Amino acid sequence: MKMKKNILLLCALCLFCGACKDDESYADQKKKERKAIAAFLARDPLVLLDPNGDTILNIPKINPISQQKFEAQDSMTDVSKNEFVLFGQTGIYMQIVRKGVGEKLKHGDAKRIICRYHEYSILGDSLCTTDRTDYWATSPEILDVSNNWGTITASFYGGSNPGAMTVVYGSTTNSTAVPKGWIVPLSYVNIGRQNDEEGIALVRLIVPHSEGTAAATSNVAPFFYEISYQEMRD
């Protein structure tokens, strides 16, 4: 188990080491990031397959929309048109695939949320980390989340069996901080337990370095995420 986790860690570190050159200024790196995100938005549909030929990710060509249009659509994105709303202040793009069962977080709520995710490196053009595998089946990401008058905060709950995100990035930064990009959807989706009629919340995100992990921030690296959110049982 330790070896497999170390291999995953090394893969992430190698990816970041190739993300920028020592002689690049921060301004150059941000320009490179903007170009990479623009190219990702304009690219042809992206399909990632696992070694068995099963689809990991299928991302049709993205159709960005404004916050104004997003709000006019009851804070939803049209998945049939592959709409992603751009939050201009942060540069985050978000698609709500499913709003999910349950209710939105209210003031005073404090919940433990289970997340499953894929993380795709936009600069590296490859899958970086994921916990949607048999190996991580019993180790999802667990978030301790609270809402204080509309301000939502979250931290990773590592426990004795931490998930892939915590193992990779917590090990390199000694931090339980949740990327700000992961928290944004919690203002729009419902949090509950899956039932026979409704699925749990599912979103897709493009997260620039300033809203990502500490490693993404230090390397000026943008990432694409697909994340599900489910309330944990008491």
Question: Where do the language-model regions lie?
Answer:
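Sec-dependent bacterial lipoprotein signal peptides
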Residues: 1-20
